[in-house]
Amino acid sequence: MAKHEMEDRGDGLVEKMISVNRVTKVVKGGRIMAFSALTVVGDGDGGIGMGKGRSKEVPVAVQKAMEQARHNMMKIKLYNGTVKHTVEGRHGATRVLIQPAKDGTGVKAGGPMRAIFDAMGIHNVSAKIHGSTNPYNVVRATLDGLSKINTPAQIAAKRGLSIEDILGVGHE
């Protein structure tokens, strides 16, 4: 069950809860019930982190997940509130396709991807999930895809060209 709650603690980070599941560990004496939480934390300017927490109580599991997400933050370079180019991310049986969108399009993404884009500050993007829609796999695949975004400087260095050649600046 995907539940997207938004919080702001005053440190400028946006916290979103992706899912909370009841999990069971079977031992010799019976079953031990616990809760597992999956969260993302973003700074609204391209920063994003994912965390998982597990505890016997929901609030403690969510708190652990938020702390882990803050610890696992990474920075993605945004371009006018969207991604610079189309990317594909994979994790397990999940494949996500993330495409840039024109200004005014909004976030066309389902499930946990919407929460990630909102926390990051991406306002115009189109995304599609192929394969498994397990929230954990979708979050990991989305972060994998976002980490593959290249800046024009990286593309120019890889091709051995100048940035002006890549962007077409000055050519008519």
From Swiss-Prot:
Signal peptide: none
Record flagged with keyword Transcription regulation: no
Pfam families tied to this protein: Ribosomal_S5 (PF00333), Ribosomal_S5_C (PF03719)
GO cellular component: small ribosomal subunit
GO-annotated biological processes: translation
Keywords on record: Ribonucleoprotein, Ribosomal protein, RNA-binding, rRNA-binding
Gene3D superfamilies in the record: 3.30.160.20, 3.30.230.10
GO MF annotation list: rRNA binding; structural constituent of ribosome
Family annotation (InterPro entries): Ribosomal_Su5_D2-typ_SF, Ribosomal_uS5, Ribosomal_uS5_bac-type, Ribosomal_uS5_C, Ribosomal_uS5_N, Ribosomal_uS5_N_CS, Ribsml_uS5_D2-typ_fold_subgr
Domain S5 DRBM: 13-76
Highest taxon, organism lineage: Bacteria
Domain text: The N-terminal domain interacts with the head of the 30S subunit; the C-terminal domain interacts with the body and contacts protein S4. The interaction surface between S4 and S5 is involved in control of translational fidelity.
Family statement: Belongs to the universal ribosomal protein uS5 family.
UniProt cross-references to PANTHER family, sorted A to Z: MITOCHONDRIAL RIBOSOMAL PROTEIN S5
Assembly with partners or alone: Part of the 30S ribosomal subunit. Contacts proteins S4 and S8.
Described function: With S4 and S12 plays an important role in translational accuracy.
Protein's recorded name: Small ribosomal subunit protein uS5
Species, as recorded: Chromobacterium violaceum (strain ATCC 12472 / DSM 30191 / JCM 1249 / CCUG 213 / NBRC 12614 / NCIMB 9131 / NCTC 9757 / MK)
Species classification: Bacteria, Pseudomonadati, Pseudomonadota, Betaproteobacteria, Neisseriales
